[in-house]
Swiss-Prot record:
This is Probable long-chain-alcohol O-fatty-acyltransferase 8. It catalyses: a long chain fatty alcohol + a fatty acyl-CoA = a wax ester + CoA. GO terms for molecular function: long-chain-alcohol O-fatty-acyltransferase activity. Its EC number is 2.3.1.75. GO terms for cellular component: membrane. Keywords: Acyltransferase, Lipid biosynthesis, Lipid metabolism, Membrane, Transferase, Transmembrane, Transmembrane helix. Catalyzes the final step in the synthesis of long-chain linear esters (waxes). Its main location: membrane. The lineage of its organism: Eukaryota, Viridiplantae, Streptophyta, Embryophyta, Tracheophyta. The chain crosses the membrane at residues 7-27, 38-58, 59-79, 82-102, 117-135, 152-172, 228-248, 284-304. GO terms for biological process: lipid metabolic process.
Length: 336
């Protein structure tokens, strides 16, 4: 455990030093290829850092924050785009907005904040799910299909909401929420674009969708250019998730996750095309059932099977227990 914490300090210390370099040096270079070349060594380093961990909690968190989000932010920053512009007022803010999955909320008064009791209900359900996983072997398959996506959503929503609340106090500014009640999505476009893990579409739109659409626009009809932009965005997302799975399991990719996102990209693009050409629509309740049902079923067979085979959730629970016991032991020694 101590070795893992030493690795944590070294990895994130290296990340802070690297981002500090980006704040003082590349930010002074003219945007474009030259600035991109100046940040590329940092991007390569961020791809390597998750490999220093054994615990999946640390490797997956570092991969998400540094290898994916921070790298995309820095590449967009090289071309004067993305969430790092305008340049934060000081180094501390630049480090936070680069290394952490946060973004300043542009219109804080326009957001419909849910009552606090909703968050506490989610936290309570998450606590129940942790105990339910102990009896996973005796649960019927139909229940497992719903259990995995619910667990993923709640663990991300609860933890990221807590992180957002703390950083809002520390930074003194309102931050964008990560989720917008995805279980209320009435379409795939609504789910992926406006409700699920909102930091990712905020980066993928300027980083993947718009460039791909611009490249395709002169070569094909606008409908097909939009389709290629949408499909490419989901394809890149699939490759990124395969990379995260590699950091966690250190195994050859199965490409199941990539196929999941390819399927989502094709279906989302087709859904958008149908909406533009017809006025046919379903009731909101039926739309929600179809959308969430499609995501849950396809997610179980293409996204969560790899998690199930690798016992990822059980490993993370064991690691969390080890970390808590280690902290308790150190605190008791310190106090005594």
């Amino acid at each position: 455990m101590e070795e893992e914490l030493k690795s944590f300090v070294k990895v994130w210390g290296s990340a802070i030093i690297s981002v500090s370099y980006c704040y003082y040096i590349p930010s002074k270079i003219k945007s474009g290829v030259h600035r991109l070349l100046s940040v590329l060594p940092v991007c390569v380093l961020f791809l390597v850092l998750p490999l220093f961990f054994v615990f999946t909690i640390f490797s997956s968190t570092t991969a998400f924050c540094l290898s994916i989000l921070a790298n995309f932010k820095l590449i967009l920053f090289a071309f004067d785009k993305g969430p790092l512009l305008p340049l934060p007022a000081n180094l501390f803010r630049f480090i936070c907005f680069t290394c952490l999955p946060i973004k300043i909320q542009k219109n804080p008064n326009s957001q419909n904040h849910l009552p606090k009791w909703v968050f506490f209900c989610k936290a309570a359900i998450f606590g129940v799910l942790l105990n339910v996983h102990n009896y996973k072997s005796s649960l019927p398959p139909i229940l497992l299909i719903c259990l995995y996506p619910l667990h993923l959503y709640l663990v991300l929503d609860v933890l990221l909401t807590i992180v957002n609340a703390l950083l809002t106090i520390i930074l003194g500014c309102d931050l964008e929420p990560h989720f917008n009640e995805p279980y209320l999505a009435t379409s795939l476009q609504d789910f992926w674009g406006r409700r699920w893990n909102l930091m990712v579409p905020a980066i993928f739109r300027p980083g993947v969708y718009h460039p791909m659409r611009s490249v395709c626009q002169p070569q094909m009809r606008s409908d097909w250019a939009r389709f290629m932009g949408c499909w490419t965005t989901f394809f890149v997302s699939g490759l990124i998730h395969e990379l995260v799975y590699f950091y966690i399991n250190r195994e050859t990719p199965t490409w199941e996750v990539t196929w999941f996102f390819v399927l989502q990209g094709v279906c989302t693009a087709m859904e958008k095309a149908v909406k533009r050409k017809t006025r046919w629509s379903l009731s909101p309740m039926l739309s929600r059932l179809i959308t969430v049902g499609f995501l849950v079923v396809t997610g179980y067979f293409l996204f969560f099977r790899q998690i199930e085979r690798s016992n990822m959730l059980e490993r993370r629970a064991t690691e969390a227990s080890l970390i808590i016991d280690f902290v308790k032991h150190k605190l008791s020694n310190f106090l005594l």
